[in-house]
Amino acid sequence: MAGKLRVHELAKELGVTSKELLATLKEQGEFVKTASSTVQPPVVKKMKKHYGVGEESAKESATTPSPAAKPGPKPAAKAAPKAAAKPGPKPGPKPGPQPVKNTNPVAGAGTRPTSTVKPGEKPAPKPGAKPAPKTAAKPTPKPGAKPGPKPGGAKPGAKPGPKPGGRAPRVANNPFSSGAPAERPAPRPRGGQAGPGDMPRPGSRPGGAKKAGPKPGGAKQGGGRRPSPAMMPSHPNPAQMPSKSDNFGGGRGRGGRHGGPGGPGGPGGPGGPRGGRGGRRGGTAGAFGRPGGAPRKGRKSKRQKRNEYEAMQAPSVVGGVKLPNGKGAKIRLARGASLMDFAEKIKADAAALVQALFNLGEMVTATQSVSDETLMLLGEEMDYKVEVVSPEDEDRELLESFDLQFGEDEGEDEDLAQRPPVVTVMGHVDHGKTRLLDTIRKANVGSGEAGGITQHIGAYQVSVSMEGEDRLVTFLDTPGHEAFTAMRARGAKSTDIAILVVAADDGVMPQTVEAINHAKAADIPVVVAVNKIDKEGAQPDKIRGQLTEYGLIPEEYGGETMFVDISAKQGTNIDQLLESVLLTADASLDLRANPDMDAQGVAIEAHLDRGRGPVATIIVQRGTLRVGDSIVVGDAYGRVRRMIDEHGNDVQEAGPSRPVQVLGLTSVSGAGDNLLVVDEDRTARQIADRRDARRRNALAARSRKRVSLEDLDSVLKETNTLNLILKGDNAGTVEALEDALLKIEVDDEVDLNIIDRGVGAVTETNVNLAAASDAVIIGFNVRAEGKATEVANAEGVDIRYYSIIYKAIEEVEAALKGMLKPIYEEKQIGTAEIRQIFKASSVGLIAGCMVETGKVRRNAQARLVRDGNVVAEKTTIESLRREKDDVTEVSAGYECGMVLSYPDIQVDDIIEVFELVEVPRT
């Protein structure tokens, strides 16, 4: 067949249904969708070969019987009823002229059995010289008869006549054969046609042999039983097809013996007397006289092997989209990765992943960050094990890609030198932490703090004299307010020893317990300073007993924790406290670092200075930081232009445990970010850009909310959202304010959304963003600059300024509560009983009532009750009269007439009058 065919056209040509052909094509590994799909010519040829049609369409004229040769010899007429499904009176049954699906375009359904003619030999003038004496039950034509007039015989060049019983022309008379006839494959038996070996040709078994000998085509012939029209499948069933050896002597049935060398079949019948496995064709002759292939063994065919291989390599189908099959492979993705990153890992098209997620009900773009759950779900669908890398591991891998490492000293043990201990002062708010540092530094830090509370981390290095030797100690002062949890945790991670300050007159408080937990999590030793022992009501022993419950057991009680009773205000026992700190450091810690390596440290604070730009407070942990070094701090990078110590003096280099302020960064770093010195500015910029992209992706993935069917109803409801823009004087304060605001829990009806935050003054850009998003700007220790105030007034943007953090928290919480939908409570005003009903043409029914309790007011809401059942829940008193006067209210004990908005009223009904009072939300 030239050109392409559609599936339904090919099915019609093959004589099967489109559904069966589609199933066969899919079994063969050809992916077609519908019956209208086109099929390539090689596939058409393969399907014709599979269904045993071959080139029948091209040879139709050779196989179509002619109605001119109906009469046939009588033996054929007797054999036909045996082989046909329905016996007919004529020797040639009606199904004979029907087209036969046959791989042999010349031979018909009744191809002559056991005729073996080798190529190159002259065919014998008679197909056989002997009749089969053992199987013959009826007379057969004489062997000397001429082959020309035999039924089904076709002379060269002449049209073949009708073949009684569906007999095929003699092989020697094949008009398409150029030489000696070759072996032909057996046709498929059809209903009403004689099977192989049934034709009463000379030299073959006569049709009556079925009564005495083995049944041709039966179980003993090696090709399975003869199919009947009722048993015929829609396409060839290998288990029931006759073996090729039933038709030609050169064939061989599966498991049977070779047939005879030609002429009539032996006593066992062609193909061997034993029953072989049906379904597999033997080694048969090729078409048009070409030699056939070797017989198949019990091994798998190439087609089967290919199908198995394709099944193993079959792609995964996710949401109707073909995607690679991971086969359990593990891939690592960063938190907040996009589908583009996923596609790059698995060598797939990102558009296919987008389409797959869209079909699964998730609408994302290729570059949009997706949540960890979505990445894992998509990986499971494709048989990939997705591992979401933690930020710490991802940052370590990022540094390793640049051949950098953070957190370990370089060099040998002899390269390490002693460094000062880093001590963090922690405790509850207003327990005297900053006063203690003031006393140690002999300075007044607390007076500069708004509200008398510390709102950022201070880093100082002081010299302490111990046993006649001056030693340096670095102190970190952390906030004690509950809003600064992240700062205290960051201070604990950056320190060697913690001083826990507890007021002797106040005892253990919530932030005290939190500080203990931070110290335990960081695995650092704790020295307890019991402060305010000079005040009345101080109970140092009670403090020791309370802290015992949290694992801090004093040395006098047999524990390992040093307790020192001090008075920061009076300066009592301060030297003893410092000595205890140094003793703990010497006894418990190995405080050494390599000062000769590239500097590494941590940023404990960062802010934006108007004249100096971004400023970061750094504690060097190892190595030496010098002016001019290229540094990267989190997602900020730059070159050290200037370093300032705690006294405001410039320093050229800072060794281990030295706190300094660093100028020269391109942006404000995050509090708690690691500092790293690199060789080139380009490397620093690349690391910072990668970190910034990772941070933004993680933030986008965290802010995306997945909506399920369960919470769809609540999402569709109207939700009030308070949008905020936070600006502060330093990064730590902004971080603490954001954490505190996000912890406010009011109700599900309102939501708090922080759309932007930053360090520095409120700019015009912030005001424009607030105007576009209907947000409120909160400035903490900063003011608006330039034209920001004018633009805010013109746009109606609300800017709030705060210097104390808990005041900002209280006002934001109050604003959220004000956004809640009001709750109304019903308050009963009075009741009235209907005594009589009057009819008025202008207003309808008028209820003549007696006010029993309270008052009845005009336009008030009322409830109509009849026999204890509520008849009308919400009705209104439209008109109220006392005698003939319109009144606004009538008190108890008086009669009145009223008109209700609900007309169905009866005598003895009770009217309950009430009003709705708004209840404030808390």
UniProtKB/Swiss-Prot annotation:
It is found in: Cytoplasm. It comes from the Bacteria. GTP binds at residues 427-434, 477-481, 531-534. Residues 477-480 are annotated as: G3. One of its GO terms (molecular function) is translation initiation factor activity. Residues 531-534 are annotated as: G4. GO terms for cellular component: cytosol. CDD domains: IF2_eIF5B, IF2_mtIF2_II, mtIF2_IVc. Residues 567-569 are annotated as: G5. Residues 75-87, 151-169, 202-211 have a biased composition (Low complexity). Residues 452-456 are annotated as: G2. Gene3D superfamilies: 1.10.10.2480, P-loop containing nucleotide triphosphate hydrolases (3.40.50.300), Translation factors (2.40.30.10), Translation initiation factor IF- 2, domain 3 (3.40.50.10050). Residues 427-434 are annotated as: G1. Residues 418-590 form the tr-type G domain. Belongs to the TRAFAC class translation factor GTPase superfamily. Classic translation factor GTPase family. IF-2 subfamily. One of the essential components for the initiation of protein synthesis. Protects formylmethionyl-tRNA from spontaneous hydrolysis and promotes its binding to the 30S ribosomal subunits. Also involved in the hydrolysis of GTP during the formation of the 70S ribosomal complex. This is Translation initiation factor IF-2. The gene is infB.
